Amino acid sequence: MATRNPPPQEYESDDDSYEVLDLTEYARRHHWWNRVFGHSSGPMVEKYSVATQIVMGGVSGWCAGFLFQKVGKLAATAVGGGFLLLQIASHSGYVQIDWKRVEKDVNKAKRQIKKRANKAAPEINNIIEEATEFVKQNIVISSGFVGGFLLGLAS
């Protein structure tokens, strides 16, 4: 049959007092990536051995390269398959393509992209400068990442 739970006062004792710690505020202020990559953290050379840096860069690069390869292969298959089906439908007479209109739309898109690229140039240059500075300060882990990325693409 069903058992009754004892009243709550039987569980409580004055000897057992616990302090509840709220770590959410600490976690908001102290992100792990600030310790690893933050401006005050200094270059990786000062923190980890060369072997550790190469392994960290190589493993993260391999993961990125492997994912890039798989996603790229999937995207290329989807785009190529869609284009192939469109060509088959066009040659079979199911679809009529107005190539002059396509060319006009492509040229319009090119002009819009050039306008937006000129406006976004300062932000992009700032990001490139920051990335270049990071690579200069952490050349060992960066070279490990590049090597791992290439291995990930090859696997």
Curated annotation (Swiss-Prot):
GO terms for cellular component: mitochondrial outer membrane. The chain crosses the membrane at residues 48-68, 75-95, 134-154. Keywords: Autophagy, Isopeptide bond, Membrane, Mitochondrion, Mitochondrion outer membrane, Phosphoprotein, Transmembrane, Transmembrane helix, Ubl conjugation. Residues 1-47, 96-133 are cytoplasmic. The keyword Transmembrane applies. It comes from the Eukaryota. It is a multi-pass membrane protein. Phosphorylation at Ser-13 by CK2 and at Tyr-18 by SRC inhibits activation of mitophagy. Following hypoxia, dephosphorylated at Tyr-18, leading to interaction with MAP1 LC3 family proteins and triggering mitophagy. Dephosphorylation is mediated by PGAM5. Phosphorylated by ULK1 at Ser-17 which enhances FUNDC1 binding to LC3. Ubiquitinated on Lys-119. Deubiquitinated by USP19; leading to hypoxia-induced DRP1 oligomerization and GTPase activity. Pfam families: FUN14. The keyword Membrane applies. Residues 69-74, 155 are mitochondrial intermembrane. The modification Phosphoserine is found at residues 13, 17. A motif (YXXL) lies at residues 18-21. The modification Phosphotyrosine is found at residue 18. GO terms for biological process: autophagy of mitochondrion; response to hypoxia. There is a cross-link at residue 119 (Glycyl lysine isopeptide (Lys-Gly) (interchain with G-Cter in ubiquitin)). It is found in: Mitochondrion outer membrane. Coiled coil: none annotated. The YXXL motif mediates the interaction with MAP1 LC3 family proteins MAP1LC3A, MAP1LC3B and GABARAP. Belongs to the FUN14 family. Integral mitochondrial outer-membrane protein that mediates the formation of mitochondria-associated endoplasmic reticulum membranes (MAMs). In turn, mediates angiogenesis and neoangiogenesis through interference with intracellular Ca(2+) communication and regulation of the vascular endothelial growth factor receptor KDR/VEGFR2 expression at both mRNA and protein levels. Also acts as an activator of hypoxia-induced mitophagy, an important mechanism for mitochondrial quality and homeostasis, by interacting with and recruiting LC3 protein family to mitochondria. Interacts (via YXXL motif) with MAP1 LC3 family proteins MAP1LC3A, MAP1LC3B and GABARAP. Interacts with DNM1L/DPR1. Interacts with GPX4. This is FUN14 domain-containing protein 1.
